[in-house]
């Protein structure tokens, strides 16, 4: 990033998405008036960033800044299948583009055995229904639910599919099964994907067959009502620091399939956890680490809700829901890329890194987990960083003035 020409922050923040839209998207429609695709893309990201309580409030804020748009034009855009196709294409290509740009910012760089495996934490996320949403047969509103994936290499987010909303209720699992293989098409890494999910995604025979067909491997938790038969140990090196906390690593049989079963006792808390997986080539401590990193998707949802204020559906129907999910994920990824670019200029989230180090140093050596200490960059976007970006874009601040603000807010808490 260079500041010699002193551009505005908003000119550089949206530049990657606009570049992809202009040069790599087939569903783009060129128009110079009204709500162009470029304007729709920018406004959708800003709608997610500005934390306005409603779509009308967002449009008023735009109008008060001399950027007015008819209300019907904005809301009708969220019913457009063509615009959804355009946005989906931008989001998909942006993930691939950002993955390359963040090449040296890999959460899992210390673990060479994961270099060529896509590793995705997957979970559902619910927000309040839209104002005009339908009620179900019992007269109740249904929250809008979307499945997302978080890349555990780069921290990038991608929506997968909607599983409920507008009077319809579905469990995450069948929706995930219907969509995940299409969702992972074009994944840049060469080896089999690893999916890390909570016990809602337990289906032992399904995952064994997926591995046999070389589609994907699973890491999840054993359910309390599962009664395995232990066949024998897999064997692991207890002296490997990565395996600290591993009690046992066994082959286990369940009602309809055999999996690897890892009993882990968290050194910091003493809590016992049991993981099941079809990954047979990874060290057991690394299996435990990847499951612990699954919680980072929960942290991302907390950012969506409490730091970005995205708590309610913007419209009704699957088209509007998917557009909103793409805009929120694209914003998350643009913020992640901006943070990485700032790091290349010498800035970093010093306050977060120092706090993590202090928390770790308080633990006695026998309660520390070396595997967790080897994970870099895996922290949530902070309130101060998000506010600084929001203010820089809202008030059209040039980089010459914004850079010292980023330095101040990233180095220490208010």
Model region roles, listed by residue range:
Residues 1-24, 31-34, 111, 212, ...:
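A short, flexible helix-boundary coil/loop motif
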Residues 75-153:
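Active-site-proximal, Lys/Arg-enriched surface segment
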Residues 92-98, 160-271:
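An internal, acidic/charged active-site-proximal segment
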Residues 287-315:
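Short amphipathic alpha-helical "interface-anchor" segments enriched in bulky aromatics
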Residues 315-340:
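Basic, amphipathic alpha-helical segments enriched in Lys/Arg and hydrophobic/aromatic residues
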Residues 43, 58, 70-75, 119-127, ...:
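Short, conserved catalytic/metal-binding motifs centered on acidic residues
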Residues 49-64:
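Short, charged amphipathic recognition helices of the HTH superfamily
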């Amino acid at each position: 990033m260079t500041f010699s020409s002193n551009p505005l922050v908003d000119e550089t923040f949206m530049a990657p998405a606009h570049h992809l839209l202009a040069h790599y998207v087939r569903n783009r429609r060129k128009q110079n008036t009204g709500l162009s695709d470029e304007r729709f893309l920018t406004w959708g990201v800003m709608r997610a960033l500005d934390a306005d309580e409603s779509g009308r409030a967002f449009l008023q804020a735009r109008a008060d800044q001399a950027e007015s748009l008819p209300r019907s034009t904005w809301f009708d855009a969220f019913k457009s299948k063509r615009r959804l196709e355009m946005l989906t294409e931008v989001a998909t290509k942006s993930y691939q583009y950002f993955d390359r740009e963040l090449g040296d910012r890999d959460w899992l760089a210390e673990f060479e055995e994961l270099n060529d495996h896509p590793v995705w934490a997957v979970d559902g996320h619910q927000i309040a229904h839209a104002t005009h949403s339908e009620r179900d047969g019992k007269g109740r509103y249904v929250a809008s639910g979307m499945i997302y994936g978080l890349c555990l290499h780069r921290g990038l987010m991608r929506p997968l599919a909607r599983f409920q909303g507008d009077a319809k209720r579905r469990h995450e699992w069948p929706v995930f099964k219907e969509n995940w293989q299409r969702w992972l098409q074009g994944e840049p890494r060469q080896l089999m994907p690893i999916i890390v999910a909570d016990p809602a995604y337990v289906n032992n025979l399904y995952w064994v067959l997926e591995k046999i067909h070389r589609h994907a491997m699973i890491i999840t938790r054993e359910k309390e009502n599962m009664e395995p038969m232990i066949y024998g140990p897999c064997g692991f090196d207890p002296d490997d620091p990565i395996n600290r906390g591993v009690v046992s690593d066994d082959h286990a049989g369940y009602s309809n399939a055999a999996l690897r079963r890892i009993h882990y006792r968290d050194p910091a808390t003493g809590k016992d956890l049991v993981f099941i997986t079809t990954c047979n080539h990874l060290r057991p401590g690394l299996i435990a680490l990847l499951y612990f990193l699954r919680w980072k998707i929960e942290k991302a949802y907390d950012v969506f809700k409490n730091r970005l204020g995205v708590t309610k559906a913007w419209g009704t129907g699957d088209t509007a829901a998917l557009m909103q999910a793409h805009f929120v994920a694209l914003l998350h990824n643009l913020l992640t890329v901006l943070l990485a670019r700032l790091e290349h200029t010498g800035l970093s989230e010093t306050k977060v890194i120092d706090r993590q180090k202090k928390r770790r140093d308080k633990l006695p050596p026998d309660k520390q987990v070396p595997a967790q200490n080897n994970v870099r960059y895996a922290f949530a976007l902070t309130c101060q960083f998000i506010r600084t970006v929001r203010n820089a874009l809202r008030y059209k601040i040039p980089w010459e003035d914004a850079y010292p603000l980023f330095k101040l807010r990233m180095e220490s808490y208010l």
